[in-house]
A protein has these predicted regions:
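ATP-dependent helicase/translocase motor core
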Residues: 1-217, 226, 230-242, 267, ...
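Short, solvent-exposed polar/charged micro-motifs at secondary-structure junctions
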Residues: 94-97, 254-259, 279
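Conserved helicase motor
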Residues: 225, 247-257, 272-277
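Conserved RecA-like ASCE ATPase "motif II neighborhood" in helicase/translocase motors
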Residues: 266-302
Length: 303
């Protein structure tokens, strides 16, 4: 039984529906039942919940209403499947991941959507066209949310993180399609400020590339060993249940992982120090040839 396939976007068995004024059964006999505004369904599953307010009403009221619904326990049963909340007025929009528990709602993670140049998009018609339509809505659920095991909450990417990760994975796909592996000038830079979520961006970029099959190895390269330990823990926390992130405790382990044909060795976290020692550690020419014949993407932290 296949319930959902994140790759079947506007294709295959994916079906999209709009649910108006869904009725929520109260979890307490002391509280009234509630009615929401709009839900977006994929294969019958309510994955987006949208709360609307009129012009002139602060968007914070829509956010608070969603928080209130969560506190009252209405997001249970099938409604526990809601992944992304959207609060909207005709002139303003905020979106945020469902944290599961109402106490975990955090205004710092309520985001506005923006275009590729980071210009905010707030008009409801553009939001409907650029964010809530297919394929974007399906992509956001399937590829640009992360279940973070470190704090037990769902995270959704900001718009600039989406554009960065998408651009990186698209670049690799283009190189593969054009058979340009081995040529020069195939890299690029993504500028992130402190606190802007570069770890999630780098992980999602690596994950998208690994899952696409456009590269044999994706190596997250850090410049300090202590950073590698933290990055490995972060990557492990972000990875899907069927994904494996490989650490490297020595240069020899790194060489083994790079040579491996096992799919579980695709995502690798290592340090510049270990990478620089590959030849110095007496790597034989046969091993180097095996590694050189692989399609390897390096994602460098704080380059």
């Amino acid at each position: 039984l296949k319930i959902y396939d994140r790759a079947e976007i506007a294709a295959g068995q994916s079906r999209y529906q709009i649910l108006r004024q869904p009725k929520f059964k109260s979890a307490s006999p002391m509280l009234n039942d509630r009615r929401g505004d709009i839900m977006l369904l994929i294969n019958g599953m309510p994955l987006f919940h949208i709360e609307l307010k009129n012009s002139g009403v602060p968007i914070s009221q829509a956010c608070e209403q969603i928080r209130k619904y969560s506190k009252e326990g209405i997001y249970n049963g099938i409604f526990a499947l809601v992944q992304i909340f959207v609060a909207m007025t005709p002139q303003k929009m905020l979106y945020f991941a469902n944290p599961g528990e109402w106490e975990k709602f955090n205004d710092n993670f309520f985001f506005s959507w923006a275009d590729f140049n980071n210009e905010p998009i707030n008009d409801y018609r553009q939001i409907a066209d650029k964010f809530l339509s297919i394929p974007m809505a399906h992509q956001m659920i399937g590829f640009y949310t992360i279940a973070d095991r470190s704090d037990g909450t769902l995270k959704v990417m900001r718009s600039y993180q989406y554009y960065a990760a998408s651009a990186i994975s698209s670049k690799v796909a283009k190189i593969t399609a054009q058979k340009r592996w081995g040529s020069e000038n195939r890299g690029g830079f993504i500028w992130h400020t402190t606190g802007s979520g570069k770890t999630i961006t780098s992980f999602k970029s690596a994950q998208l590339i690994a899952n696409s099959g456009d590269a044999d190895k994706v190596v997250f390269l850090i410049d300090r060993i202590e950073l590698g330990t933290q990055s490995f823990k972060n990557y492990q926390a972000f990875a899907d249940d069927d994904e494996s992130v490989q650490d490297t405790n020595s240069t020899r382990t790194l060489i083994t992982k790079l040579k491996s044909t096992n799919s579980s060795d695709t995502l690798i976290v290592t340090s510049i120090q270990k990478m620089s020692k590959i030849k110095a550690d007496g790597t034989n020419s046969h091993d180097l040839e095996i590694i050189n014949n692989k399609r390897v993407v390096f994602i460098v932290d704080e380059a």
